[in-house]
């Protein structure tokens, strides 16, 4: 579900056309402040919601079959939404109990979601972060980045219903619909190297031979959503994302996490188009176009030999466009 309601938000008038590129640095910030979360909600969309009394096994299978990465959790006793069930929860459980002599992984999946949250996820438990449909998209971007989350439920304060799940991808796609209506800020023509957007130190990576269990530990420790897979020369050959981990549940192969990430990724080799890459000399505008067109969450920054130099994510892009006006994040 990546449809975006373009018709609900009128294109802004190009009233800044006489301004210089230098003075246009806040144009995207202004756009986000003048549009509400409601403007982005499609007229028709699919939303997966789980009751906390649902069996964990069924919940993760539903994530896979619906192609979603997370779902709001409804507590029937409290008559309210209490959190999100995400692939990160699945990873935390797998990593913590795979080598445990006390708990068998296959037993864990028989539990209800509420049991998981109360017993097994208490260390990583987070209260629900949500937003009103009347809040601005600027507030939504700020909340996503400040709380270091990837999904923000839009909840109607009057009915208590979840209307939509906002993500970095959907917000950037919405902005891209209107981007040609704006005077182009100077920073859009600057390179990644000039703007220093992205992460270039301590890049979390795995080798082609790295066991899945080790990769899960890196996800937990570094709190990243994807790991470039590199060969012996440091060249990127694949990418292992959190979303790939959910296939362990679908295929019931989570009882053998000692296989390599390369073997674990074979399930999608028939449709994998390759790692989406970019270079430090490319402009921010080119990077945004590639991210939106490919509908990916990040690009791997490489040199001319495909050696990994960094990662630029949707979060990095939105922070630069909306919160810091092209400047390096504080």
Curated annotation (Swiss-Prot):
Q: In which tissues is it expressed?
A: Highly expressed in heart and brain, also found in kidney, white adipose tissue, lung and spleen.
Can you name a GO cellular component term?
Answer: nucleus
A GO BP entry is:
fatty acid biosynthetic process
Q: Which residue positions does Phosphothreonine occur at?
A: 262
Provide the binding site for ATP 2: 69, 151, 169, 241-244, 268, 276, 297-298
UniProtKB keywords: ATP-binding, CBS domain, Fatty acid biosynthesis, Fatty acid metabolism, Glycoprotein, Lipid biosynthesis, Lipid metabolism, Nucleotide-binding, Phosphoprotein, Repeat
Phosphoserine is found on 260, 269
Q: Check the record and name the SMART domains matching this protein.
A: CBS
This chain's protein is named 5'-AMP-activated protein kinase subunit gamma-1
Q: What does this protein do?
A: AMP/ATP-binding subunit of AMP-activated protein kinase (AMPK), an energy sensor protein kinase that plays a key role in regulating cellular energy metabolism. In response to reduction of intracellular ATP levels, AMPK activates energy-producing pathways and inhibits energy-consuming processes: inhibits protein, carbohydrate and lipid biosynthesis, as well as cell growth and proliferation. AMPK acts via direct phosphorylation of metabolic enzymes, and by longer-term effects via phosphorylation of transcription regulators.
Q: Give the family this protein belongs to, as stated in its UniProt record.
A: Belongs to the 5'-AMP-activated protein kinase gamma subunit family.
Annotated residues for binding of ATP 1: 69, 84-89, 129, 150-151
UniProt's post-translational modification comment states: Phosphorylated by ULK1 and ULK2; leading to negatively regulate AMPK activity and suggesting the existence of a regulatory feedback loop between ULK1, ULK2 and AMPK. There is some ambiguity for a phosphosite: Ser-260/Thr-262. Glycosylated; O-GlcNAcylated by OGT, promoting the AMP-activated protein kinase (AMPK) activity.
Tell me the organism's taxonomic lineage: Eukaryota, Metazoa, Chordata, Craniata, Vertebrata
- Which PANTHER family does the entry link to? 5'-AMP-ACTIVATED PROTEIN KINASE SUBUNIT GAMMA-1, AMP-ACTIVATED PROTEIN KINASE, GAMMA REGULATORY SUBUNIT
Motif interval(s): AMPK pseudosubstrate: 137-158
Cysteine pairings via disulfide bonds: none
